[in-house]
Amino acid sequence: MYTQTLYELSQEAERLLQLSRQQLQLLEKMPLSVPGDDAPQLALPWSQPNIAERHAMLNNELRKISRLEMVLAIVGTMKAGKSTTINAIVGTEVLPNRNRPMTALPTLIRHTPGQKEPVLHFSHVAPIDCLIQQLQQRLRDCDIKHLTDVLEIDKDMRALMQRIENGVAFEKYYLGAQPIFHCLKSLNDLVRLAKALDVDFPFSAYAAIEHIPVIEVEFVHLAGLESYPGQLTLLDTPGPNEAGQPHLQKMLNQQLARASAVLAVLDYTQLKSISDEEVREAILAVGQSVPLYVLVNKFDQQDRNSDDADQVRALISGTLMKGCITPQQIFPVSSMWGYLANRARHELANNGKLPAPEQQRWVEDFAHAALGRRWRHADLADLEHIRHAADQLWEDSLFAQPIQALLHAAYANASLYALRSAAHKLLNYAQQAREYLDFRAHGLNVACEQLRQNIHQVEESLQLLQLNQAQVSGEIKHEIELALTSANHFLRQQQDALNAQLAALFQDDSEPLSEMRTRCETLLQTAQNTISRDFTLRFAELESTLCRVLTDVIRPIEQQVKMELSESGFRPGFHFPVFHGVVPHFNTRQLFSAVISRQDATDEQSTRLGVVRETFSRWLNQPDWGRGNEKSPTETVDYSVLQRALSAEVDLYCQQMAKVLAEQVDESVTAGMNTFFAEFASCLTELQTRLRESLALRQQNESVVRLMQQQLQQTVMTHGWIYTDAQLLRDDIQTLFTAERY
């Protein structure tokens, strides 16, 4: 019964998708515009390029429906540990990890039962072959010395350049982890090399999801489970502006819009950073059309002063994601621990032991994480101890919950996710098409003189918008100056108070150094929390003020435009942008970690030292001071020197923080304002273009106008049917989802 219902729903989804494709083809043929020299060169929502994108979206949904494939898009920055997270989800290493961007092209990772060894299919390799030929010629002509100035040439890049010079093409098929790593690393290095040699990488050739590389492998966490109708596939997406390629943002947006669900990987230590903000904006742009989930990676770096899991969920759900995701869909995890633990358990189950660390480097990482930094090779021979350590590391990784709640659920309900994705895409398409066509149909019924008047009124609104933007900039600048002046005054107060507390603390030179360290850490943590709370409230208030100022300026223009259109008989349905908060969030916990000027930590041992502990260690020339079994320094410690040095570092930190505040607030607000006004102006320009096209069509002979009216009315009606049927489809799918939970 369940299978029959799925089949009927998939047939209905396919019917609606095919009907939508037919309607798009009709739209392409309709004479809805009259070309002229004064036509603005804009990427309008229903221009030919946009219609082509909608065709691609519908074709992609048809492809997923035919397979009943649920595509879970995974997005995150390089530093968030996206590749490690995917490896942890799959249960084995299918993506390479390097300390540089590794996803220049989207990559599909498809769960294939029985496929123990990963295999990569790269059928659409022809554009890469053409690129290699271009690069081959450029390498012959270029100055290698100049190339080294603009490109880091490591051994991988050197091998790729040699391969290009020899004319070695990419294969269409790679079997095994190492050949796959080599292929993916070479593709990403190819992007960097092409940029350095000023050759365009063929990103557009891989816009269609069927053209991107596909890795097929059995997901370890799904091995042995009963089979379900449907297929689960992960989509590794390029991060925003990855590898210095800002146009990857468009590719990312396209891939996210075509996914069945989106999983964002955020960095616990960088939750309020600019890079993670770009990821959040990308997934928020998808809206409510697909389910959203968040993995907060690197949660193993939490300490007693950091936000706990519930606080992280509340921060992301309420503040960072603006209520678009519930706390239940947010999972703090350690992807590295999860990957290492599961890899070790898998090796023990299949081979009875772990490989030698010299043969597979991940074993050393596992031992360090599970056994501690003092592990020995002999420890790996105690299989019962290793098995217990792997289980504990898996438990500590917190990965079991998202595996159960997300991966298992996605696998069991892949067909329903695919159908729900199609239903939501159909609803969005039909709604947008109906609003656009209804506007165009009504435009043919409005008198030419009235259309001219509407065009003139929109032109006046555009001019008023430009005038108001110049005027409001001064007011906003004044508000920013007031906020920064107040923030700097508060920062100086905290600086003075902290230095006074430090001076009082160091007066007692009889206190043991370990107790002094603890009290210093407490003082710094208290100051951090005070500044964090104040800045959160202070800049939330600034954000509200900016929104109010802009709303007061924009609302009269918006209301006037809508009223004038309504008087001409145009129905509401034209959406203007809404100004969102643009004041950056400041992670004072991270900033305070830099209060003491520290050496760049090169290993995990260094990063685990506390701020004050590391400072004392450096001053006493004892790198491991402050750990267990610490030894008291033999030399006399001059507390006055420590106090002066610590106070100097606090002063420097406060100065730097004030500078960062000014730069980031000004940059963020200016960019946000410019974007908002540009989007608002673009909406008005689009409206003006539609009205001009309606006027041009209205001026055609009466028989042509009547024919277009009939065509538009029929098309509007058809899209209304598509919308209604898509609503019914969505409701039926939701009923099945609800039934699956009980």
From Swiss-Prot:
Keyword vocabulary terms for this entry: Chromosome partition, Coiled coil, Cytoplasm, DNA replication
Compartments, as annotated in UniProt: Cytoplasm
GO biological process per UniProt: chromosome segregation; DNA replication
Region (G2 motif): 102-104
Family of the protein in this entry: Belongs to the TRAFAC class dynamin-like GTPase superfamily. Dynamin/Fzo/YdjA family.
Organism: Escherichia coli
Name assigned to this protein: Clamp-binding protein CrfC
One annotated GO molecular function: ribosome binding
Recorded GO CC terms: cytoplasm
Chain positions covered by the region annotation Clamp-binding consensus: 41-45
Top-level taxon: Bacteria
Coiled-coil ranges (or none): 440-472
This protein's record includes keyword Nucleotidyltransferase: no
Pfam families named among the record's database cross-references: Dynamin_N
Region entry G4 motif, spans: 297-300
Residue span of region G1 motif: 76-83
